[in-house]
């Protein structure tokens, strides 16, 4: 295997101008949100001197992102996605501008902060879902895993570097300039997205399920139930979101089990991202996998074993290694989940299906924190990790046995003619696979 084959495939960025624009917009969105989150937490705590006040802001953001994702998915299947993306990004820029104006006031208002946070959460949820739904129409079908790897890599890098940059800017100038910087960069990317071509939902001409074009969320649910591959991916994704890496256990384990302090805690929080970035940066082998369904299930099983290993670790070094393995396995899963869901979902339903995947991550994180905290109270932090890891590993095995269609799932591998126009630069969207061929 050549070293070049292991590196991340940037083909989608080379061949599709529209995907490049979407990609840049998503990167700026993630970095802006990460930077603003740090400034927001610092400002709210400085005003209230209360962790509860910070938690309220975080909860408002989580809930509104969830609502925005679901509503954005519904709208993405009913209207031109270019228009939806532009309105969402412009709204996010206004929310950041509102936070900046409020921060520069002699006495900032807490209610204004919460209002802007809610507005930005809704806009971000709509934007992320619409961007994810439209991306597959801008690249060739065989480039879906590569597009997923690029999206995953930027998400992981953003989760590590954006708070760091935000913290540096916050320490140097306060929250106002952080919010202002985020507002300006978000506004600039909105202007760049004006170059996108119209992106209406695509409908297969031979589709006989006309009632599914009403835009109803029930239609997406019916499709997921009927399509064994997509349905199994959504079910397994929900379990992984709920029972995956238990980050809320980190403080108690570090302070009581490992005998460490704040520095060790901070290092432990970076472990999953380190594993994820390493895999994303060397994801060429993933995008060329001959049996992506089997590899996805293996990654899900490995992630469960990593959580079990974390629970049994007994030391910070072993715990870090297990978390890095878990982060790496989770990224392999996410890349292939993205490609398989997008490939097996018709474009007219893609917004609603993607919104479910996005909502799973948000809602699963919130509910998962509560679940693992309760289990840790009944048993111990290590016991809670063992329970969660076992559930994830067993779920992967059950799905592998019960849904052979997912285990045998494949992705397009054909190489297009070099003289063909680049994906996403023409006027015709790339159609999704016929759903009747994916229900086995």
Feature annotation, model-predicted:
Residues 1-440:
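Alpha-helical transmembrane-bundle signature of multi-pass membrane transport and export proteins
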